[in-house]
């Protein structure tokens, strides 16, 4: 029997998206039964968000910074992934492969195939927003504004409304 997935390992793009949407502080509320992990290597990638993240880590119980110190198989997997992908994505995928946790990333070009082949669950920014809408954290109008704000601030995200988005992830 597989162990229950209890951690969401968040990559920099999701953190950046939620910051650009002005709703970073809401991210840990979307899946409150999960521990949100920001690996140190990802934290280093988002230096402009350190103050916001530090405040969340200090005051919220379900978000934490974790030192990325892979050993043995995880270290080899990370090194292999790093040849093709960014350090943050590589760290998140290697960590989740060896811990059976969930990757939080919208960089589908990099993570989708690897996660599917290795049976790693992943959630994207739109998946997070979908669940925020379904759980009444945000209204449809708020979700659609967040999506547009993220796009307006230069991040890649599909031009879609939350009502038309089809989420395939069950958490």
What is each model feature region?
Residues 86-102, 110, 131, 149:
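Acidic, metal-associated active-site segment
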Residues 14-15, 42-43, 92, 110-111:
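Alpha-helix capping/helix-boundary segments
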Residues 10, 105-106:
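Short beta-strand scaffold positions
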Residues 5-10, 18-20, 25-70, 126-130:
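PIN/NYN-family metal-dependent endoribonuclease catalytic core
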């Amino acid at each position: 029997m597989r162990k229950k997935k209890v951690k969401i390992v968040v990559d920099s793009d999701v953190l950046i998206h939620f910051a650009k949407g002005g709703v970073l502080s809401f991210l840990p509320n979307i899946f409150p039964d999960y521990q949100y992990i920001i690996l140190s290597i990802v934290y280093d990638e988002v230096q402009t968000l350190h103050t916001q993240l530090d405040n969340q880590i200090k005051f919220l119980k379900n978000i934490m910074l974790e030192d990325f110190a892979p050993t043995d198989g995880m270290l080899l997997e990370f090194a292999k992934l790093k040849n093709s992908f960014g350090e943050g994505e590589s760290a998140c995928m290697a960590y989740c492969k060896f811990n059976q946790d969930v990757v939080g990333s919208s960089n589908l070009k990099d993570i989708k195939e690897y996660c599917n082949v290795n049976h790693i669950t992943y959630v994207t920014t739109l998946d997070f927003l979908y669940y925020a809408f379904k759980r009444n954290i945000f209204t449809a109008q708020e979700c659609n504004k967040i999506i547009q704000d993220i796009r307006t601030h230069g991040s890649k995200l599909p031009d879609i409304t939350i009502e038309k988005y089809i989420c395939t992830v069950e958490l």
